[in-house]
From Swiss-Prot:
Protein name per its UniProtKB record: Integration host factor subunit alpha
DNA repair recorded as keyword: no
UniProt keyword annotations, A-Z: DNA recombination, DNA-binding, Transcription, Transcription regulation, Translation regulation
Gene transcribed to yield this protein: ihfA
NCBIfam families reported in the protein's UniProt record: himA (TIGR00987), PRK00285.1 (NF001401)
PROSITE patterns: HISTONE_LIKE (PS00045)
UniProt organism field: Vibrio atlanticus (strain LGP32)
Assigned GO CC terms: cytosol
Amino acid sequence: MALTKADLAENLFETLGYSKRDAKETVEVFFEEVRKALENGEQVKLSGFGNFDLREKNERPGRNPKTGEDIPISARRVVTFRPGQKLKARVENIKIEK
């Protein structure tokens, strides 16, 4: 099971008494701010949760798994997430059911 934006909005509705419309808009605004910051090359630091960073990946050699042909994997920018200490501590001993 995955946590969705709809789940987050529902939680705001239930715990803070937001209207459903305001809860959904709040979640959308939050994620839009994160997107904008990353698009502008900024780090996103969420205290007690973790950091989102942009990393540049250089071009590197790769291989087509079907044909075995060598192909270059182009340089690109990727988003990485590094969990903070508080998040790590909270999930450290959780048993995951499959």
